[in-house]
């Protein structure tokens, strides 16, 4: 196995409309089959709807929605002497953002509204108001970590 050290992370360029790296990461994650234009259209229309419904600046509302979904702790499986324990560990800040984006998109796609714009804006609005599938997922993750606090000494 070659020993070249860690692979350097590629910087994501900020998106053209809001000049936000978070928005660019969200669009890239939402993209299917390389169709970035379609993903951008859906994202920007969703932010317009979000701005109408919240009355706040679109990008600020989006950032607040992502912040409300970020998990601070998660559990990782750790095998100790034949038993597997769910060990709570803190989540790195870049992983917090990645998980929040992933959960928002997953739960937006699973919603019942017609069209992805309606689904995404609905999920972002719910996340903005601290409810919805993605926020529930974060709460479940925190609950799992809290329940397995006794195994925290197995951290590595």
Swiss-Prot record:
SUPFAM superfamilies: Ribosomal protein S7 (SSF47973). Disulfide bonds: none annotated. PROSITE patterns: RIBOSOMAL_S7. Transmembrane segments: none annotated. CDD domains: uS7_Bacteria. GO terms for molecular function: rRNA binding; structural constituent of ribosome; tRNA binding. Part of the 30S ribosomal subunit. Contacts proteins S9 and S11. NCBIfam families: rpsG_bact. Belongs to the universal ribosomal protein uS7 family. This is Small ribosomal subunit protein uS7. It comes from Oleidesulfovibrio alaskensis (strain ATCC BAA-1058 / DSM 17464 / G20) (Desulfovibrio alaskensis).
